[in-house]
């Protein structure tokens, strides 16, 4: 082969080698880029999943008055659906008992109570955040079941009380309460020192005595002397005995009766602790607890986030959700939403609550004492 031909073939071979190197390098770069991007995506997804898991691995802990636990469960579900923030099933009990547990340092995020004093420093001690919100009102009723109507004395009492509701005269209501306290029927009552519905049942009897018998202690003393009262730790503990006929009536909140699909006697606004029109009349009556005197007043639902809330930011989101959505979500249970909700505070409230005040959803209403 001649020298010029050899040089020509060499240059051709070199060019081919360079092309092969470029192609291989390009394929390698593409492969690295593709797999690197995929790995990066997988890592990002893993980190996002890890972050999501860390956010949801510790659900909010709601302490709820046991008479409100069905509604509380509904609020939790709606909140989680709206925000993605997880919540544990409500821990329920009497409001005063729950306040005592919170004061002892038990883990809690948010507290819903049916007693104002339970959300103040008098019961929460150092766990009081200094603020609480009243977001709905309730009233007392006497629940009864189908088993109640199998008892002739109870059946007659239901008829008399329904007639009193229609007539709405002092004499007809006197007949109703006289039959209720005769001892021929049993009335269940939650422990007043643990469950506010308990002392409120006694306050209703005092108000009724004054309104219909001109003696505030008349029906109260009559029920006690006739052994007509049955007490348990809470009203919730007496629902099963009511349904089986062991007791014929139960002092309970209207919302709880509705939530548990119980029949109930509608009591007049003058005595049911549910009408702001009669708030001054309610305040004339009281009940002595182990921790002090409880005065009659309109029944309200309260919400607060204790000082050592397990997650203050998410807890405040739940509080805001309840304030904003109570009118829609709670009305079907017989509760009357408070609009705007009433804020009671003895300290500066968090910015989120200040925003609700600015939006007209919260109304400053005084110090959080009681």
Language model features: what each stretch is:
Residues 129-130, 366:
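N-terminal helicase ATP-binding lobe
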Residues 132-134, 178-179:
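Short, charge-rich binding segments
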Residues 131, 140, 185-187:
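Generic beta-strand structural signal
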Residues 89-101, 105-129, 135-137, 143-144, ...:
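Ligand-binding clamshell of periplasmic/extracellular solute-binding protein-like
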Residues 1-55, 370:
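Secretory targeting signatures
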Residues 16-24, 85, 102, 235:
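Hydrophobic aliphatic residue packing
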Residues 54-83, 91, 95-96, 100-103, ...:
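Exported/periplasmic ABC-transporter solute-binding proteins
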């Amino acid at each position: 082969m001649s020298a010029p031909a050899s040089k020509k073939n060499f240059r051709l071979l070199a060019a081919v080698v360079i092309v092969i190197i470029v192609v291989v390098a390009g394929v390698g770069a593409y492969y690295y880029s593709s797999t690197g991007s995929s790995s990066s995506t997988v890592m990002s997804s893993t980190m996002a999943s890890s972050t999501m898991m860390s956010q949801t691995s510790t659900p909010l802990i709601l302490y709820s008055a046991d008479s409100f636990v069905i509604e509380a469960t509904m609020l939790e579900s709606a909140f989680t659906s709206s925000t993605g923030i997880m919540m544990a099933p409500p821990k329920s009990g009497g409001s005063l008992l729950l306040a005592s547990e919170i004061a002892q340092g038990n883990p809690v995020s948010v507290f819903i109570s049916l007693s104002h004093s339970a959300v103040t420093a008098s019961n929460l001690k150092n766990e009081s955040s200094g603020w609480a919100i009243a977001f709905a009102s309730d009233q007392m009723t006497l629940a009864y079941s189908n088993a109640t109507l199998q008892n002739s004395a109870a059946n007659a009492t239901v008829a008399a009380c329904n007639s009193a509701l229609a007539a709405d005269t002092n004499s007809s209501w006197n007949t109703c309460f006289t039959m209720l306290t005769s001892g021929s029927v049993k009335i269940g009552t939650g422990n007043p020192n643990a469950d506010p519905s308990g002392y409120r049942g006694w306050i209703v009897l005092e108000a009724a005595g004054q309104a219909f018998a001109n003696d505030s202690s008349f029906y109260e003393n009559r029920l006690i002397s006739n052994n007509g009262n049955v007490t348990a730790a809470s009203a919730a503990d007496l629902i099963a005995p009511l349904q089986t006929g062991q007791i014929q009536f139960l002092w309970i909140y209207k919302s709880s009766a509705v939530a548990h699909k119980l029949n109930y006697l509608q009591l007049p606004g003058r005595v049911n602790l549910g009408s702001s029109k009669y708030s001054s009349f309610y305040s004339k009556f009281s009940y002595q607890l182990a921790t002090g005197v409880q005065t009659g007043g309109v029944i309200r639902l309260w919400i607060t986030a204790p000082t050592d809330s397990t997650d203050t930011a998410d807890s405040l989101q739940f509080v805001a959700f309840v304030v904003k959505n109570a009118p829609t979500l709670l009305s079907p249970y017989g509760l009357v939403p408070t609009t705007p909700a009433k804020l009671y505070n003895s300290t500066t409230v968090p910015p989120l609550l200040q925003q609700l005040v600015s939006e007209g959803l919260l109304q400053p209403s005084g110090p959080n004492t009681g």
